[in-house]
Design a protein with these regions (language model features):
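Short, well-formed alpha-helical segments that are part of the catalytic scaffolds
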Residues: 17-34
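A conserved acidic beta->alpha catalytic loop
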Residues: 43-53, 73, 103-104
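Glycine-rich, basic loop-to-helix element that forms the pyrophosphate-binding segment
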Residues: 71-88
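Short beta-strand-to-loop acidic/aromatic patch adjacent to the donor-nucleotide binding site
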Residues: 93-104
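Conserved donor NDP-sugar-binding/catalytic core segment of glycosyltransferases
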Residues: 104-139
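Conserved nucleotide-sugar donor-binding
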Residues: 152-165
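A short, conserved alpha-helix in the catalytic core of glycosyltransferases
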Residues: 160, 170-203
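Non-catalytic, C-terminal membrane-associated alpha-helical segments of glycosyltransferases
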Residues: 239-290
């Protein structure tokens, strides 16, 4: 594969893994690893899974460009971003690429080449690809400004993370990308979708459950807690920024519909309801630092 030229900015990648399908995860990693200067693999899996050995054996190439981080605990994503940010600061990386284990590039080389070219012109932008499963806007430009992103595929200049103070670990997983996007824009930077570059991103395992055949992600009670807590904190932290339509969408999807899914379709109803409402309470009482 063609390597990036010396004139390009120095690029650090970060991918988070949690009990992945190893062939799929390693295949996805090899689509972008050759075009990075270094990749941090943040392993949230239990140690007994022995993921490090299995993944590195499967990669076979470019393993000298990998830093592995994992101690058997699941720290989610925000601490991983901050680890990568501090590493980038200390080792003079210009850009940080964020990746999920399930995301698959069609042509990463062309994407990161355009990112590097645009970064050399202006350092005030965060870049992301077009994600068919998530993006609903009408494409009108090859570089189109947008207000949100998902973490996977997004490239953030280290200087922008310096300005906003990295990821807010009040959002370990859920609403983290929303919080980052809002803080980036509040600081005066833009989010630019490079729309001709496609990233296929898995949105989770949706199942039809219950007597009413309702579609649900069937999240664990702990994940339901995280979702209901984090979106309340997001609203309290950014209510001056969020539009009424954004607030309505969040309320409808993460609270009203989720409550109905628990009641009408999902198992362990009492445990799920307990964690769902505990998340709401903890989100309301969480101390906000703006």
């Amino acid at each position: 594969m063609e390597e990036m030229t010396k004139n390009n900015p120095k690029i650090l990648g970060l991918v988070t893994l949690y009990n992945p399908d190893i062939p799929d995860a390693t295949n996805n990693i090899m689509r972008y690893l050759p075009y990075l200067d270094l990749l941090i693999i943040w392993d949230n899996s239990p140690l007994e899974v022995n993921l490090k050995q299995k993944v590195l054996e499967s990669l076979t190439q470019e393993t000298d460009k990998i830093i592995w981080h994992g101690d058997g605990k699941n720290y989610c994503i925000a601490p991983a971003i901050n680890y990568a940010w501090h590493y980038a600061q200390e080792n003079d990386f210009d850009l940080i690429l964020l990746m999920d284990q399930d995301s698959q590039w069609e042509d990463f080389h062309s994407y990161i080449t355009e990112v590097a070219e645009r970064f050399q012109i202006s350092q005030g932008n965060v870049f992301c690809p077009y994600i068919p499963s998530d993006d609903t806007f009408v494409i009108s430009e090859e570089a189109q400004e947008k207000s949100t992103f998902i973490n996977s595929g997004t490239v953030i200049p280290t200087s922008i993370l310096n300005r906003i103070g990295g990821a807010d670990e009040a959002f370990p997983l859920d609403a983290l990308d929303h919080d980052l996007a809002i803080r980036i824009q509040k600081a005066g930077y833009k989010i630019v979708s490079l729309t001709k570059h496609i990233l296929q991103h898995s949105v989770g395992n949706i199942q039809m459950m219950g007597p009413f055949h309702i579609y649900t992600h069937n999240y664990s009670p702990q994940r339901l807690y995280s979702i209901s807590r984090s979106h309340i904190i997001k609203y309290r932290k950014h209510k001056d920024w969020l539009s009424s339509s954004e607030i309505k969408v969040t309320l409808k999807e993460h609270y009203i519909r989720q409550l109905l899914r628990i009641l009408l379709a999902e198992p362990q109803k009492m445990c799920r309801l307990k964690m769902f409402f505990k998340g709401i309470y903890d989100g309301i009482t969480f101390p906000i630092n703006i």
